[in-house]
């Protein structure tokens, strides 16, 4: 906030994502399950800081699943919630049909935090362990090829040329192509990578967005 304040800008909102989210997690692998990092424990200090800068709205994310969850965080002072997995499993979602069905089939033990091998970004990465690309990565069946370049790191000259998967394939695997495939792109060329939040195991059917919104609003 201080940086943007100096430039004359004020954030429209801040999104606080807890460790139950899908995909990349902003925590060290050893800190993902700490009690202190639970969303409800992180929220108060973030809300207090947002208040100091003019009551910037705080939106919470990661593990929000029910109407009761939404009400709980609204009562704590959240301006809103951000939800991914629940809307992924809707009729209108652009996710591939195989992705949606993988979510419906997923059990608690099927949802894991990938780390070694993991994302070339170096962050813990929550995924369905049966994801075709993840299975291949564990067996190092897919040779890394960085033809998208979305998560390249800087080299000694400050240019984005370093691919973690190419540099250390035993520790990292390509994710860009797999994520695109899970969204229905290049499915004939690339295996899919299914990222979900921990509560994906509760999804038992594909809903319409209208049905989901009625459920989430408590109507």
Question: Across the structure, where does each feature detected by a protein language model lie?
Answer:
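Active-site-proximal beta-alpha core segment in soluble small-molecule metabolic enzymes
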Residues: 1-9
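Conserved active-site-proximal phosphate/metal-binding subdomains
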Residues: 2, 19-59, 65-219
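Non-cysteine beta-strand/loop elements that form the S-adenosyl-L-methionine
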Residues: 12-20
